[in-house]
């Protein structure tokens, strides 16, 4: 029986990284977590690392500013998964260029998964500013990976449920509104809503699969392909409460960017791409992509209906 690939997770204490670590351990992979010495100032992250260590993970100290430490860490594994923070923290995404250089020098990595996990940056050249900068930077990382001929898989995980399902996709809310809900446009644009735990499972499933080599894996479980209005209706049915619906035109929505911080403007522009332009589901998956729930039908993914029950 072939041994399971050894996996190094970079950003393993982050929002999605911790789910990837958990899935890697659960699926029987020797799991390594990269950590920086500065982590000692964050007690919660230290506790998380120690919890993962107790469950079998190995901790490797390294730094993006120490090339040799990165190379040494990479040489101990077969697969590298980066889950460094993105969005408005631009320098984190571009720091992956240092990781690419380490992987290139080590020469032993069978698969690299860079930090993406949202909309496919390869399809977002039309994105509006300032949200487009996230996709531009992720493309720079892709270009470096491909120029170095590093075997890779890109993961497009769409909407993280923890951010938007509970709040019914209301800006700044993570819990269900009690009286009214804003619908973007007519509320009928399709999106894809994914439990973060499932992102971890599908990511780990993909790293040894020849069908995902040098391809983009789109996580599109069919029961979770829903419009915002459909998500709202599911909550109303589950909670047995009707909400007043306020339909927001694209002009009114974009006017809300004025006076916001840079990070908030990025978030608003991404909402525009998802709920007005439909950029999560307005395209067919091409020959360079595959769909996760079709590849792994045995994974029992969490439906939006099931996910919502925690908010009752």
Swiss-Prot record:
NADP(+) binds at residues 11-17, 36, 45, 142. It is an enzyme of class 1 (oxidoreductase). The keyword Oxidoreductase applies. Pfam families: NmrA. InterPro entries: NAD(P)-bd_dom_sf, NmrA-like, NmrA-type/Isoflavone_red_sf, PCBER-like. Substrate binds at residue 270. It comes from the Eukaryota. It catalyses: (+)-lariciresinol + NADP(+) = (+)-pinoresinol + NADPH + H(+); (-)-secoisolariciresinol + NADP(+) = (+)-lariciresinol + NADPH + H(+). One of its GO terms (biological process) is lignan biosynthetic process. Keywords: NADP, Oxidoreductase. Its EC number is 1.23.1.2, 1.23.1.1. PANTHER family: PINORESINOL REDUCTASE 1-RELATED, PINORESINOL REDUCTASE-RELATED. Reductase involved in lignan biosynthesis. Catalyzes the enantioselective sequential conversion of (+)-pinoresinol into (+)-lariciresinol and of (+)-lariciresinol into (-)-secoisolariciresinol. Abstracts the 4R-hydride from the NADPH cofactor during catalysis. This is Bifunctional pinoresinol-lariciresinol reductase. It comes from Thuja plicata (Western red-cedar).
């Amino acid at each position: 029986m072939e041994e399971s690939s050894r996996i190094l997770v970079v950003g393993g204490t982050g929002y999605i990284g911790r789910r990837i670590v958990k899935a890697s351990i659960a699926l029987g992979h020797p799991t390594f977590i990269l950590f920086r010495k500065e982590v000692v100032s964050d007690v919660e992250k230290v506790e998380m690392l120690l919890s993962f260590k107790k469950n079998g993970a190995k901790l490797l100290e390294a730094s993006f500013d120490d090339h040799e430490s990165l190379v040494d860490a990479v040489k101990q594994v077969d697969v590298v998964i980066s889950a460094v923070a993105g969005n408005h923290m631009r320098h984190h995404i571009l720091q992956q260029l240092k990781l690419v250089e380490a992987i290139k020098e080590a020469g032993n990595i069978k698969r690299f998964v860079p930090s993406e996990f949202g909309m496919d940056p390869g399809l977002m050249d039309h994105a509006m500013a300032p949200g487009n900068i996230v996709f531009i930077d992720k493309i720079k990382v892709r270009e470096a990976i491909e120029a170095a001929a590093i075997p890779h898989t890109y993961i497009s995980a769409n909407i993280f449920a923890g951010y938007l399902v509970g709040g019914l996709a209301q800006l700044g809310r993570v819990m269900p509104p009690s009286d009214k809900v804003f619908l973007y446009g007519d509320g009928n644009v399709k999106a894809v809503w994914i439990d973060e735990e499932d992102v971890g499972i599908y990511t780990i499933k993909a790293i040894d699969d020849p069908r995902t080599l040098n391809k983009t894996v789109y996580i599109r479980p069919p029961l979770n392909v829903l419009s915002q209005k459909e998500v709202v209706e599911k909550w109303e049915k589950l909670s047995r409460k009707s909400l007043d619906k306020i339909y927001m035109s694209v002009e009114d929505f974009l006017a809300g960017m004025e006076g916001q911080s840079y990070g908030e403007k990025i978030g608003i522009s991404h909402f525009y791409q998802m709920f007005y332009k439909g950029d999560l589901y307005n395209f067919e998956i091409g020959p360079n992509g595959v769909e996760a729930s079709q590849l792994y039908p045995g994974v029992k993914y969490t439906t939006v209906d099931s996910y919502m029950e925690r908010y009752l």
